[in-house]
């Protein structure tokens, strides 16, 4: 057959059909505000919660289960009562969760296990670093000098500043 014959032409069979219409939910919120952060209402609940600093996907699933919220629903589809319950739970610092799931265990001052979110987490991490600097611990000294803190090698990686290149020996 020739290249231009009718048998090789692709025909769009769906051209006359209309696209299935999406149901418009009047209560749907495209932006949900939790812990001073706007979350995308079109994401699933646990994944939307993971956009908050201090909450990961696993903790998002656990929070949804604890509050009996559907994990297969988008966060924008939740009712206002459910969202209020979610806000209260997320913004609380102490949780009834296993210690290994929290992000600030055995806090130095109170000894409590906390899960901090958003700016609270950022402030607490900075305070912890300042405490390490103040007591002159090894990690604090490394932070002061701007060096790597967690045992990484520093000979070849993590160099700052401009590269000079290879310097030749003068003849």
Swiss-Prot record:
Q: Quote the biased-composition stretches of kind Polar residues, using this chain's numbering.
A: 1-11
What are the BP-aspect GO terms?
Answer: translation
Q: Which domain of life is it from?
A: Archaea
Tell me any Pfam family this protein matches: Ribosomal_S13
InterPro entries referenced in this protein's UniProt entry, alphabetically: Rbsml_uS13_C, Ribosomal_uS13, Ribosomal_uS13-like_H2TH, Ribosomal_uS13_archaeal, Ribosomal_uS13_CS
Entry GO MF terms: rRNA binding; structural constituent of ribosome
Show the segment(s) annotated as Disordered. 1-24, 144-164
Q: Do you know which PROSITE patterns this protein is assigned to?
A: RIBOSOMAL_S13_1, RIBOSOMAL_S13_2
One GO CC term of this entry? cytosol
Q: Basic residues composition bias: which ranges? A: 144-158
**Keywords, in A-Z order:** Ribonucleoprotein, Ribosomal protein, RNA-binding, rRNA-binding
Q: What does this protein do?
A: Located at the top of the head of the 30S subunit, it contacts several helices of the 16S rRNA. In the 70S ribosome it contacts the 23S rRNA (bridge B1a) and protein L5 of the 50S subunit (bridge B1b), connecting the 2 subunits; these bridges are implicated in subunit movement.
The entry's family comment says: Belongs to the universal ribosomal protein uS13 family.
> What PANTHER family is this protein classified in?
30S RIBOSOMAL PROTEIN S13/40S RIBOSOMAL PROTEIN S18 (PTHR10871), SMALL RIBOSOMAL SUBUNIT PROTEIN US13 (PTHR10871:SF3)
Alphabetical list of HAMAP family matching this protein: Ribosomal_uS13
Complex formation? Part of the 30S ribosomal subunit. Forms a loose heterodimer with protein S19. Forms two bridges to the 50S subunit in the 70S ribosome.
Q: What is this protein called?
A: Small ribosomal subunit protein uS13
Q: What is the lineage of its organism?
A: Archaea, Methanobacteriati, Thermoplasmatota, Thermoplasmata, Thermoplasmatales
């Amino acid at each position: 057959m020739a290249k231009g014959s009718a048998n090789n032409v692709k025909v769009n069979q769906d051209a006359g059909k209309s696209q299935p219409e999406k149901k418009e939910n009047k209560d749907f919120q495209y932006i949900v505000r939790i812990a001073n952060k706007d979350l995308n209402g079109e994401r699933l609940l646990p994944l939307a919660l993971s956009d908050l600093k201090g909450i990961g996907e696993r903790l998002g699933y656990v929070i949804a289960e604890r509050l009996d919220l559907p994990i297969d629903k988008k966060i924008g589809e939740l009712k206002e009562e459910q969202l209020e319950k979610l806000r209260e739970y997320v913004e609380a610092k102490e949780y009834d969760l296993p210690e290994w799931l929290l992000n600030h265990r055995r806090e130095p001052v109170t000894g409590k296990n906390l899960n901090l979110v958003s700016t609270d987490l950022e402030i607490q991490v900075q305070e912890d670093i300042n405490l390490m600097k103040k007591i002159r611990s090894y990690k604090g000294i490394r932070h002061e000098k701007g060096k790597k803190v967690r045992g990484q090698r520093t000979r070849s990686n993590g160099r700052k500043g401009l590269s000079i290149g290879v310097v030749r020996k003068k003849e």
